[in-house]
Amino acid sequence: MSSPPEGKLETKAGHPPAVKVAGIRIVQKHPHTGDGKEKKDKDDQEWESTSPPKPTVYISGVIARGDKDFPPAAAQVAHQKPHASMDKHVSPRTQHIQQPRK
């Protein structure tokens, strides 16, 4: 395989086109530059630092205390599939398939 020319790179949809080897298209993946990620991280930190205070939640006229009222273990039990109290007894039935004679 030949390396792409260092000068002007031909791009399609913002990335270099795939290379054909033995009739199969092979995509060459190159690592991205880290400059854009650093800028995004700085912007994310600014938004995270200015979060509004959590509103108080009232349940039946009483202030909810969050995890103290509803522990995570209780929430897990509520979302688990209920088990059957009686096991299903499947009676073995022979299935007869009627077919025409030869």
UniProtKB/Swiss-Prot annotation:
Keywords: Acetylation, Apoptosis, Autophagy, Phosphoprotein, Translation regulation
Domain of life: Eukaryota
Biased amino acid composition, Polar residues: 92-102
Stretches the record annotates as Disordered: 1-102
GO terms (BP aspect): apoptotic process; apoptotic signaling pathway; autophagy; negative regulation of autophagy; ribosome hibernation
InterPro entries tied to this protein: DAP1/DAPL1
Coiled-coil regions listed: none
Signal peptide: none
Subunit annotation: Associates with ribosomes; inhibiting translation. Interacts with eiF5a (EIF5A and EIF5A2); inhibiting translation.
Keyword Acetylation: yes
Family in the record: Belongs to the DAP-DAPL1 family.
Acetylation as UniProt keyword: yes
Biased composition (Basic and acidic residues): 32-43
Organism: Rattus norvegicus
Record PTM text: Phosphorylated. Phosphorylation by MTOR inhibits the suppressive activity of DAP toward autophagy.
Phosphoserine found at: 3, 49, 51, 91
PTM-bearing positions, type N6-acetyllysine: 29
An example Gene Ontology molecular-function term: ribosome binding
Described purpose of this protein according to its UniProt entry: Ribosome-binding protein involved in ribosome hibernation, a process during which ribosomes are stabilized in an inactive state and preserved from proteasomal degradation. Acts via its association with eiF5a (EIF5A and EIF5A2) at the polypeptide exit tunnel of the ribosome, preventing mRNA translation. Involved in ribosome hibernation in the mature oocyte by preventing mRNA translation, leading to ribosome inactivation. Ribosomes, which are produced in large quantities during oogenesis, are stored and translationally repressed in the oocyte and early embryo.
Modification sites for N-acetylserine: 2
UniProt name for this protein: Death-associated protein 1
